[in-house]
């Protein structure tokens, strides 16, 4: 009986995982990138070689981790995942690399956060498939070389500019993920609703897409939260009225802007002239990295903010939008 009582919770976890596509043909958006990736994968399989190292870069929530997992499934190899902050010393990297089998995929998220000493160890591993480890201390120190099987490193970053040039140049397949179109987001939301067994009206899906900032992760997160309200109220489906009401409760306006976005815009609006990112960070009590990664990309995309050599400035379009806000 215990297994039955856990069934609903387990099914929910599986559904949330299954919202992610599992093969390239099911991946919505990034059309040119996907087509190129298919060619690279097919070529590697034809030659029975490991796929060349891949660098996925772009704003958060666009599918970098999902793509890395799909690549390993398309290649029919094992997938190992870690992140830059977790690899603090050479031994951490060696422990991961020595568990890989031939052609396996190693995914390093936030690869821009690797320290330089780890990068230097990674150079040899990526180019020559070997590790040079220092053994011993003082005069007796020697280098121990460990051979590695050919593998594929997939790095993901939201801040390409923070990668050192030597590391960036060692990726044979750099791929830039862009914001998704409105129609692509609508399709992603509909697919997510099917996986979650949630009935959704066309107008509701389109309203969520309007406020999802061109980002699938945000679209699916909003969908889940709206579904929560629908289930608690015992409604039968997600309608436009329900979606609009819940999104307003969540603090997401018609443009997909949240409280932090509005605070950012209002600060620029009330400050004369261009404003530096450090000044904005202090005024909003927000980390510079968070502002540059999660706030500014979308505001720049919708032409609300411009970056200039002297700092950030509001566009006339943003000023007009703010004038209509309460």
Curated annotation (Swiss-Prot):
Region (Small ATPAse domain (RuvB-S)): 181-251
E.C. number(s) listed in UniProt: 3.6.4.-
Listed GO MF terms: ATP binding; ATP hydrolysis activity; four-way junction DNA binding; four-way junction helicase activity
Keyword annotations: ATP-binding, Cytoplasm, DNA damage, DNA recombination, DNA repair, DNA-binding, Hydrolase, Nucleotide-binding
Region span, Head domain (RuvB-H): 254-326
Localization per record: Cytoplasm
GO cellular component: cytoplasm; Holliday junction resolvase complex
Keyword Phosphoprotein part of the UniProt annotation: no
Positions annotated to bind ATP: 19-20, 61, 64-66, 127-129, 170, 180, 217
Pfam families, alphabetized: AAA_lid_4, RuvB_C, RuvB_N
Chain sites annotated for binding Mg(2+): 65
Domain of life: Bacteria
Function statement: The RuvA-RuvB-RuvC complex processes Holliday junction (HJ) DNA during genetic recombination and DNA repair, while the RuvA-RuvB complex plays an important role in the rescue of blocked DNA replication forks via replication fork reversal (RFR). RuvA specifically binds to HJ cruciform DNA, conferring on it an open structure. The RuvB hexamer acts as an ATP-dependent pump, pulling dsDNA into and through the RuvAB complex. RuvB forms 2 homohexamers on either side of HJ DNA bound by 1 or 2 RuvA tetramers; 4 subunits per hexamer contact DNA at a time.
Stored HAMAP family: DNA_HJ_migration_RuvB (MF_00016)
Assembly and binders: Homohexamer. Forms an RuvA(8)-RuvB(12)-Holliday junction (HJ) complex. HJ DNA is sandwiched between 2 RuvA tetramers; dsDNA enters through RuvA and exits via RuvB. An RuvB hexamer assembles on each DNA strand where it exits the tetramer. Each RuvB hexamer is contacted by two RuvA subunits (via domain III) on 2 adjacent RuvB subunits; this complex drives branch migration. In the full resolvosome a probable DNA-RuvA(4)-RuvB(12)-RuvC(2) complex forms which resolves the HJ.
Domains (record comment): Has 3 domains, the large (RuvB-L) and small ATPase (RuvB-S) domains and the C-terminal head (RuvB-H) domain. The head domain binds DNA, while the ATPase domains jointly bind ATP, ADP or are empty depending on the state of the subunit in the translocation cycle. During a single DNA translocation step the structure of each domain remains the same, but their relative positions change.
Family label: Belongs to the RuvB family.
Name under which the protein is recorded: Holliday junction branch migration complex subunit RuvB
Lineage, opening ranks: Bacteria, Pseudomonadati, Pseudomonadota, Alphaproteobacteria, Rickettsiales
């Amino acid at each position: 009986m215990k297994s039955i009582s856990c069934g609903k919770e387990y099914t929910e976890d599986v559904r949330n995982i299954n919202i992610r596509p599992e093969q390239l043909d099911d991946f919505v958006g990034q059309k040119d990138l996907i087509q190129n990736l298919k060619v690279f994968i097919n070529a590697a399989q034809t030659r029975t070689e490991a796929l060349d190292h891949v660098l996925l870069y772009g704003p958060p929530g666009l599918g970098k981790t999902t793509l890395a997992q799909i690549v390993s499934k398309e290649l029919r190899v094992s997938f190992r995942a870690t992140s830059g902050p977790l690899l603090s010393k050479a031994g951490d990297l060696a422990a991961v690399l020595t568990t890989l089998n031939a052609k396996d995929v190693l995914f390093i998220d936030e690869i821009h956060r690797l320290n330089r000493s780890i990068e230097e160890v990674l150079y040899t591993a990526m180019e020559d498939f070997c590790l040079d480890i220092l053994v011993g201390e003082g005069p007796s120190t020697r280098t121990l070389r460990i051979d590695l099987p050919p593998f594929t490193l997939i790095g993901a970053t939201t801040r390409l500019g923070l990668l050192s040039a030597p590391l960036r140049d060692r990726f044979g397949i750099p791929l830039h993920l862009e914001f998704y179109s409105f129609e692509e987001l609508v399709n992603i939301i509909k697919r997510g609703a099917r996986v979650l067994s949630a009935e959704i009206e066309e107008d509701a899906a389109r309203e969520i897409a309007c406020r999802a900032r061109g980002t699938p992760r945000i679209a699916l997160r909003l969908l889940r939260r709206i579904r929560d309200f629908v289930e608690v109220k015992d409604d039968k489906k997600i309608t436009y009225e329900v979606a609009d009401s819940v999104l307003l409760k969540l603090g997401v306006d018609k443009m997909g802007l949240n409280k932090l976005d509005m605070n950012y815009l209002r600060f620029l609006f009330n400050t004369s002239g261009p404003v530096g990112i450090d000044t904005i960070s202090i005024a909003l009590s927000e980390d510079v990295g968070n502002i540059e990664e999660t706030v500014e990309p979308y505001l720049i995309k919708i032409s609300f903010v411009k970056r200039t050599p002297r700092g950030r400035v509001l566009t006339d379009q943003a000023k007009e939008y703010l004038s209509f806000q309460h």
